[in-house]
């Protein structure tokens, strides 16, 4: 039995491949390298000592996905990471985001149906909750009040998967709503390597620490939070990857539709993260306070009870280890995967 990991060369996908391989699964990776490096998969093999099948494929194209399933009849489940994911870019390129992010899932579902594959894990996000009325956030909070096209593509895909699941009682779907993944594999061989200037806090801090950027821009210090900066639920990417292995095992019980938050249940402010990173790297991180960004919310963290009770999953790593592992990756790879060239 093999797991198809769509977008498996990406940040979360590559860490998930490691956890699947270490758990004894056969893995088939598909990626078009739009926002990933071929170096990643070599390093996954180096870390695990295991080989896997790879297809350079565009998951919006039927012929690419059909080829994978035709040549790998042992695929019994799909984990779907493939997506455009930059919030700011989604605002300026909504057509590209809706086309790519919705079609990736629709094409995979269509081909799965033809090949009698019945298990699907979807990489969703806590942004589907919009600005929550309260925290912590449970899975029954309302969704859909998203603030950007990226988040809306995730909410729309969740709705599509819910409808398809209702229509097909043989289909099992896990909607995993991630909070804020950070950190890197303990080896320092793989980590987060965004193209251009990072959109997310942790890779930005890491680039400042390694001297590639001058200072961190903190957007807003007038939120109703303990220090005025935005609070988020940061989760170690290795913990998040383990959650996908637990989700695959859940689908093997023929659970139908399963929705679950993957977060720690603890919120940390932007300044908390900066100070934790300063401890990890042993140097000050310069930052400047700027105006709030449109669409940002004050506070967002998970209630992880369902994941604990129904997946048997608990986040193991705290903010100190997340920062230490991010720094280990960045100092070993100051130019990301380009350092290997």
Question: In which residue ranges do the predicted regions lie?
Answer:
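C-terminal substrate-binding subdomain of Rossmann-fold SDR/epimerase-dehydratase oxidoreductases
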Residues: 201-341
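Oxidoreductase cofactor-interface core, primarily capturing Rossmann-like NAD(P)-dependent enzymes
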Residues: 176, 187, 216-218
């Amino acid at each position: 039995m093999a797991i198809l990991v769509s977008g498996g060369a990406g940040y979360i996908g590559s860490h998930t491949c490691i956890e699947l391989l270490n758990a004894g699964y056969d893995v088939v990776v598909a990626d078009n390298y739009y926002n990933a490096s071929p170096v990643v998969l070599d390093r996954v093999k180096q870390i695990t000592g295991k080989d896997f099948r790879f297809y350079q494929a565009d998951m919006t194209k039927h012929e690419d996905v059909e080829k994978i399933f035709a040549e790998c009849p042992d695929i019994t489940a799909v984990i779907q990471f493939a997506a455009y994911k930059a919030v700011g870019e989604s605002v300026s390129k909504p057509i590209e985001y809706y086309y790519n992010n919705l079609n990736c899932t629709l094409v995979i579902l269509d081909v799965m149906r033809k090949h009698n594959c019945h298990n699907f894990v979807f990489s969703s996000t806590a942004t589907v909750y919009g600005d929550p009325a309260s925290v912590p956030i449970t899975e029954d909070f309302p969704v859909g009040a998203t603030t950007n096209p990226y988040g809306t593509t995730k909410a729309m895909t969740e709705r599509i998967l819910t409808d398809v699941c209702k229509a097909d009682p043989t289909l099992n779907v896990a909607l995993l709503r991630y909070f804020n993944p950070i950190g890197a594999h303990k080896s320092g061989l793989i980590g987060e390597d965004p193209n251009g200037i990072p959109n997310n806090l942790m890779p930005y801090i890491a680039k400042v620490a390694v001297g590639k950027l001058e200072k961190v821009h903190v957007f807003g210090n007038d939120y109703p939070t303990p220090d005025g900066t935005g609070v988020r639920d940061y989760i170690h990417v290795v913990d998040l990857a383990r959650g996908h292995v637990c989700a695959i095992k859940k689908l093997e019980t023929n659970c139908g539709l399963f929705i679950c938050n993957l977060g720690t249940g603890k919120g940390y402010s932007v300044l908390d993260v900066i100070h934790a990173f300063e401890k990890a790297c042993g140097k000050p991180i310069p930052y400047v306070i700027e105006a709030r960004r449109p669409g940002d919310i004050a506070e967002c963290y998970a209630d992880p009870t369902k994941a604990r009770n129904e997946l048997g999953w608990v986040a193991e790593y705290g903010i100190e280890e997340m920062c230490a592992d991010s720094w280990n990756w960045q100092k070993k790879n100051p130019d990301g995967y380009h350092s290997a060239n």
